[in-house]
Each structure stands twice: as structure tokens, then as C-alpha cells.
Amino acid sequence: MYRVAIIGESLGAQVAALACAASGFHDIHRLQGSRHPNEQPQVYSLGANASRLLRALVPESIEGLGFQPDRRQVRFAKSAYLLAELPLGEFYQQRYGSPLVNFSAPALTAYLEEEIGNPLKNPMSLSDAETSHQLTVLADSERGIKACDDDPSFLIYHASLPDHPLRKANVLWRGKGQYVEQLADNDQVHFRFITRADIPFDPEQWHDSLQDAFAAKMQVGGVSLNGFTASETLFAGRVAYLHSALAPTSHIRVDADNTALEDAWVLSRMMENYEEDIGDGLAAFERFRRPRHRKVAAQLRDHLLKLTEPSVSKRFSQHVGMALQNRLMPELALAQQDWLYEHDVIKGFR
């Protein structure tokens, strides 16, 4: 097999290294990317579409490091009234074939580094990497995770606390054109705050149990709606781009970049199948993954606009529809997430 360079330090970059090694690539050079160590995420939440890849590559990681929440809840910001709830845990695993798992990002990163056993090397320019390797995989945006749009329409904050009364659930708190994602790993409870740039957070409009999180929150980035247009090009020359290199670097959902893990698996299998026909392999990778990128971009944009809806009447309509659907037609509510979690890139690429 030929020489492969993987640029980046994200989870997608690590999975790319593991997947390429599993596909028979042994001359793999891992290069530091643009992310500063202090800018790495604090938590990963892997749905079945991503956790099944870890189970295939490093099965011990889920049992040893992962925290499996037992339900997903939607609650009102101030009253904490339970608007909707769907089961996770064993029910979710039986439906999709793999669990939804939350990880401490530093712990999972350190564990995978040991499993990879191939230390990161000093940064190299993309052009130099392409010159000295037959295949280059760009896994991180060259702008860095804190890079925002010049005029971001939405701001993103993060906080971590030792505990919370609802730590066993993944909770979406819905406010007035704002929302908070809450999820726990084995050690901490994490909160991701998203708001329109012109609507600052008012802690008094949120539940008492969130006050410590509001006091601890720090801005981690911002995004514009322009960032939710899927790239039509997933490779250039002999450089392949994972989703994490193309999407907004500040994520409006904590699991927004799990698509990069799917890309890493498919790319490794495509290049194994096409052997020395690198150009044909990259073209096949692009054809296979481009529809998924389009779907994810459209869904993320819809997710952001829906949860930051400024109109009171439109939010009320959303709340009524969500409550009725989850209580009277839970199967329909589950079916609406199947597109994300049923997606199994392992099939056909073993």
C-alpha cells in the first residue's frame, strides 16, 4: 500500500487512522492540524451511526469509557415542564443495532491515541503533504474550531459542571428563540448554549437547575446560515476532505460532526477496494458520500432555525405538534430520526 497523510486531531482524524490501518494501510503519517489543544471539544455524543464504527474498530472503548443515557427529553426553559420524551438505552440499541453513547472527549481522545500507536508529527502544509504522500486526508478545517464567520448570526457557548439532577438523560431545553443541549459523560455534565446573535441569554428566563451552568458558560464560536450549504467537492487532486474539514467549525448540535466518522470509514474502504487507482477511488468516495452531506447540512439548518424561532405563535405550534406526536404517535417521532441513526456505512465496506 502507498503512503497516506492524515491531517488533523479531531475524532474524525483518529477514526481515519484506525480505519486506514484496518484496511491494510501501514505507511500512515499523522500530522497536527490547525486546532489548538485548548480548543478541543469537551464531550462527544455518538449515535448509532457513529458508535457502530467505534465498536468495529475499538469495541472496548464503549464499555470502558462511554456513558449511555436512558432517555432523550425536551423541556421548557423556565418551568422544566417535560414537553417530549423518547427512550434511549436498550430500546435504542435494539432499534438501531448500536447504542447512543456520550464520551468525555479528552478521555476518548487519549484512549484512541494509545490504540492508534502512531504519534502525531509536526504540522506540514497541505501542498507539502500532497507532494510527499500518495493520499492526503484532511480531517480538520484549516480555520480552527474557534474561527467564526465575520458576522455570525448565531452564538455558541459551553459549560461543564460536576453534576445535575437530570444527568441520566440527554435534555434539550427550549427557550424563547434559544436552546440548551445538556448531556453527561462518566465524569461531568455538559451544556451547549445556542442563541441568535441579537438575543442575549437572560438566566432569569431559565430553570434554577441551570443557573450554575449559565454562570460558567464561555463562548466557543459562532455560525452563519451560509455555513449550512454542503460542499459539492469532497476531494481535490489526491486530497480527500472529511465532513469535519468542510462543515462549520462551531457546531449547533453536539453530534453534528459524526458524519466525519462515517466519511473516514467509507474512504478507507474505497481506497482499499480501488488499490492503486487513487483518483477513481476518490471519485467513488465523493459520489457515495455527497448525498449524505447534503442531507446532514439541510437537517442541521432546519434544526437551528426551528429551535431559534423568534415568533411566539410559531414556537407554540411547534410545541403542540411535538407533544402530540410524542404522546400519541411515538413511532412517527422515532421514524423522523431513523435517517440519521439507521445509516450504516459498514454494510458493503467490510
Q: For each predicted feature, which ranges?
A:
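C-terminal helical "tail/cap" subdomain of flavin- and related membrane-associated enzymes
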Residues: 1-2, 63-64, 269-350
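Conserved N-terminal helical subregion
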Residues: 2-4, 47-166, 198-200, 346-350
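Conserved mid-domain beta->alpha element of the FAD-binding
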Residues: 6-23, 224-306
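Conserved hydrophobic helix-helix packing surfaces used for dimerization/oligomerization
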Residues: 4-6, 28
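Acidic/histidine metal-binding catalytic segments
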Residues: 64-66, 206-224, 278-284, 296-297
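Conserved FAD/dinucleotide-binding core of flavoprotein oxidoreductases
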Residues: 84-86, 91-96, 104, 162-230
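Glycine-rich FAD pyrophosphate-binding loop
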Residues: 21-42
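Histidine-centered metal-chelating micro-motifs
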Residues: 158, 178-181, 246-247
